[in-house]
Amino acid sequence: MRLKGFYIGRAQRVAALLLLVLFGECVWSIAHRPLDANDYRYARCGREMWERPSPLAGYFTTCGNLNGDGTLAYRVAGFPLTVQRLVLLSVDHFRKPENREFEGGILNGTTWEARHELAWVKYLLRLPFCLFAVWLGGGLWWVSKRLFGNEGGAIALSLYIFCPAVVRYATTPNSEILALWGLYGMVYTAMGVAHALQGPRKKWKPRILLLTVALGLTAAAHLLAAMVGFVAGAAFFFYLAERRRAYVAQIMLFVALGAMAIVFASFGFHLAAFTYVFTGGSARFWFSLAAAGNFVRSPVNAGILVAAGVALVVYATTRRSRYFGNTAPLLMLLALVPLYTTQVVSAPWLWALPFLFTFIGGVFADMLESRQRKVFLLLSGSVVVTQAALCWMSMAGMLQS
């Protein structure tokens, strides 16, 4: 089946089904988790960014300087609520004065105060983050499929959708899932730009523009993720550009300037608030394996850990698995796992997970083309089924994630 030039085959239908499962997991989690103070904080700050930024000098919202967080998560959380408020006020405007429901201005208050007037607050606030997780899942599948084939893409996506940490962060307002989305996309977009440079010039600009947007949105989500992605993307870009390496520095400079403009726009072009990007300390980091240790010790990640262990052994012992497609995500994994932020509460270990799943998908795809195909086919199915069961048990509260 073809849809406007896009071929929809069995692999695409399987991927769509898996992404639908992830969306269902997110909706179930959202429905069973009540709103808390963190939700209302994101709603308040996000709505203020869209509706009325703080007039206080040096501050962008009445929440202060957002604890060093980026602006993107607040804007994503507040946008649906702001749109609903505008729709309600617009509809109310066409009623007769005596029939108007919002004359008292209650919709101008906080989300907590207007919770009885605003419908579906829980879903409007949290579903955008779920959609970003689904979007990332689609990107993860597409990258893995292009690199490793249908089986590699299916394995990588299956582990992603059944990872309890992904589901947990995809169902609450936070900067981590957006940084995760942006960092993964930025690294592989940089590789795509390097490949585009080998072709006609007409294909350069769209990919460079896409890289600029990816870096800008990632920086608006989390500055450290953008810095890591910029350095890693530039390194992979330079490695792959080959005869076009003279263009790398120029392109990355323009990308950085464009990304800075996007971050400035995310602060509503308020210069005083924008300067906090450079003084807030959100990019300060050091090294620790404590968070990675917690992930490894959690029983809900057993399937992922078994697959990762097997993939590492195969990569170390089998020459056919040691090529750039597998090495690049492994290098990103090794770079991200030991990071932790010292100024703000963050989870760089989470950003490493899509690269881990890409690495596993690549190595397993290699072995599925070898004489050990039946063994790895059985292992792949067992790992995915086990991880799905553990994920659903975690969601139901039967296992501590």
Where are these regions (language model features)?
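Transmembrane-helix signature of polytopic, membrane-embedded enzymes
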Residues: 12-13, 96-112, 116, 140-162, ...
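Perimembrane helix-loop-helix junctions
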Residues: 2-5, 188-198, 227-258, 358
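Hydrophobic, aromatic-rich transmembrane alpha-helices
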Residues: 135-140, 237-241, 300-323, 336-337
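Interfacial juxtamembrane loops and adjacent helix segments
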Residues: 43, 51-128
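Membrane-interface transmembrane helices that cradle and orient dolichyl/undecaprenyl
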Residues: 145-147, 151, 186-208, 218, ...
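Membrane-interface alpha helices of multi-pass inner-membrane proteins
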Residues: 156-157, 205-222, 333-337
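Membrane-interface helix-loop-helix junctions at transmembrane boundaries of multi-pass membrane enzymes
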Residues: 6-8, 145-147, 151-152, 197-205, ...
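Short acidic/glycine- and proline-prone juxtamembrane loop motifs at membrane-interface regions
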Residues: 37, 165-178, 345-349
